Amino acid sequence: MSFLSAEEKNLVSGLWGKVNVDEVGGEALGRLLVVYPWTQRFFQSFGDLSSADAIMSNAKVKAHGKKVLNSFSDGLKNIDDLKGAFAKLSELHCDKLHVDPENFRLLGNVLVCVLAHHFGHEFNPQVQAAFQKVVAGVASALAHRYH
């Protein structure tokens, strides 16, 4: 049984098809690093993260944000099996990178804010509610290896 209704799946896929993954990915990761500065410790090799401007213009942040959102896109293709879709990434982030799984929830919430900013009125309460479910599901799937 899916955690999303058919209508919610349509809302998510309809909006996601319009997302510029390159732009939104970099912005979401950048905002995470600005708003939650302790997350920067995982990205020390990215160079200058000394200010919000430095983070938001950092090419490595943008590139990794794109990579993150491409993985998110791949997961959306398997929306009814997020744990399976994100199993390898969960293992990587748990066993090798030792990322606090709370960071997945934080990034999901930042992503929702970035989508709202980019899509304005199109990101209505129904779309937001559907995306909140999706990012919670993805965060749970990424944290699965930790349990």
Curated annotation (Swiss-Prot):
One Gene Ontology molecular-function label: haptoglobin binding
A Gene Ontology annotation in the biological process aspect, one of them, is: hydrogen peroxide catabolic process
Residues the entry annotates as binding heme b: H64, H93
Tell me the CDD domains matching this sequence. Answer: Hb-beta-like (cd08925)
Question: Which cysteines share a disulfide bond?
Answer: none
The answer on whether this UniProt entry bears the keyword rRNA processing reads: no
As stated in the Swiss-Prot or TrEMBL entry, residues carrying the post-translational modification N6-acetyllysine are: K60, K83
Q: Which GO terms describe its cellular component?
A: blood microparticle; haptoglobin-hemoglobin complex; hemoglobin complex
Domain of life the protein comes from: Eukaryota
Residue span(s) of domain Globin: 3-147
Q: Which residues carry this modification: S-nitrosocysteine?
A: C94
Question: Which residues does this entry mark as bearing Phosphoserine?
Answer: S45
Q: Which Gene3D superfamilies match?
A: Globins (1.10.490.10)
Reported tissue expression: Red blood cells.
The function of this protein is: Involved in oxygen transport from the lung to the various peripheral tissues.
Q: What else is known?
A: In the cat family (felidae), the oxygen affinity of hemoglobin depends little or not at all on the association with diphosphoglycerate (DPG).
Supply the name of the protein: Hemoglobin subunit beta
| Organism (species) | Panthera pardus orientalis
Lineage of the organism: Eukaryota, Metazoa, Chordata, Craniata, Vertebrata
Q: Quick one: which gene encodes this? A: HBB
